[in-house]
Regions:
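A residue-level detector for the "anchor" residue at the start of short, highly conserved motifs
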Residues: 3-217
Length: 217
């Protein structure tokens, strides 16, 4: 049992910290990490809400466990990303190297290999494993936003967290527009809007901290 509990919440931008075992953790915007100031000898247990990337120090005697509200991810030493925002229906775990397992009381333990991503949906309690390009899911920790056929609704959800803004769509059809691209997270938000608006028949209007998304026609 640890002597104290650390609690880090990042409202905007990104935050990097080192844990007592040498593990490094990166937190994305609107994310919270709770962790022991000093880990116990037999396990290293933390709790994540939001999105985090972890480079775990190897220790075969003490598994590293990430608790989320949908289950646990267990590792010994590896690099992986966990996205588990409470307002989203799916938790996503993406493995860069090593091995991780996902544990939930409703489904059998699922083990990931490098380059695989596990998706677990809140509603139907089903887990899916798929092969992915991990760069698309971990670029945020290097200040890159990488989108591949991503809906405008999901893109704006990410930007809203990063820039701490509200988003209002004129109609639901605009939410389903798809975009691909690679942008720096510290780009001025109006530059994002200009790039997205090119050839997409969509217009962005920024008023205070609210973005109104409308058809350009």
């Amino acid at each position: 049992v640890s002597r104290g509990l650390g609690d880090v919440y990042k409202r905007q931008g990104m935050y990097c910290l080192s844990l007592s075992d040498g593990t490094r953790a990166w937190l994305n915007a609107d994310s919270r990490l709770k962790y022991p100031v000093v880990f116990a000898e037999n396990e290293r247990r933390i709790r994540l809400s939001g999105e985090g990337y972890f480079k775990v120090a190897k220790d075969t005697q003490a598994p590293f466990i990430v608790e989320t509200d949908l289950g646990e991810i267990r590792v010994m030493g590896t690099e992986f990303n966990v996205k588990c925002y409470p307002d989203e229906t799916i938790i996503a775990t993406t493995l860069v190297n090593g091995k991780v397992s996902f544990i939930n009381s409703e489904v059998p333990e699922r083990i990931l290999a490098p380059g695989q991503q596990l998706l677990f949906e809140r509603g139907n309690q089903e887990a899916e494993i798929r092969q992915v390009n991990v760069c698309n899911y971990i670029g945020w920790k290097d200040n890159q936003l990488i989108f591949h056929k991503e809906t405008l609704e999901e893109i704006m959800r990410i930007l809203a967290r990063w820039y701490d803004i509200e988003v209002v769509f004129e109609n639901n059809d605009l939410k389903q527009l798809e975009f691909s691209g690679n942008l720096n997270k510290y780009t001025d938000i109006e530059t994002f809007f200009r790039l997205f608006g090119i050839g997409a028949n969509v217009r962005f209007q920024l008023s205070g901290r609210t973005v109104y998304i409308k058809s350009a026609e």
